[in-house]
Amino acid sequence: MANNKSAKKRIEIAERNRLRNRTYKSSMRTLMKRCFAACDAYSATPGDEAKASVQTSMRAAFSKIDKAVKVGVLHRNNGANQKSRLSAAVRKVLEPAS
C-alpha cells in the first residue's frame, strides 16, 4: 500500500486509466469480431449487401483502432498489426485467389 499522498493519487489515476483502456480495447475487439463475422457471412453467401457490410465493419474497426493508438491505449505497431490482420482477412474474402 502506498504511504504518501502522491503515490496514493497515482494508484487512483492508474486505476481510472486502466478502466478507460479496458473499455477502448473491448469495443475495438468487438468491432474486429464483427468484421471477421461479416467476412465469414460474405464468403458463405456473396452479394452486394454482404460486401457493403464487410466494408463498413472494416471502416468502423479501423477507426476505433486508430483512435486507440491516438489516445495511447495501443502501441502504434500493435495497432498496425491489428489493421493488417483485418485487411488481410477482408482481402482474402473480397479478392479470392484466381
Swiss-Prot record:
Kindly list the biological process annotations in GO that this record carries: translation
The protein's matches in InterPro entries, at most eight in alphabetical order, are given as: Ribosomal_bS20, Ribosomal_bS20_sf
Provide the species name: Synechococcus sp. (strain CC9605)
Q: What is this protein called?
A: Small ribosomal subunit protein bS20
Q: Which residues form a coiled coil?
A: none
Look up the domain of life of the source.
Bacteria
Provide the function of this protein: Binds directly to 16S ribosomal RNA.
List the HAMAP family: Ribosomal_bS20
Question: What SUPFAM superfamilies does the annotation carry?
Answer: Ribosomal protein S20
Gene3D superfamilies recorded:
Ribosomal protein S20
Alphabetically sorted, this entry's keywords are: Ribonucleoprotein, Ribosomal protein, RNA-binding, rRNA-binding
Protein family per UniProt: Belongs to the bacterial ribosomal protein bS20 family.
One Gene Ontology MF term: structural constituent of ribosome
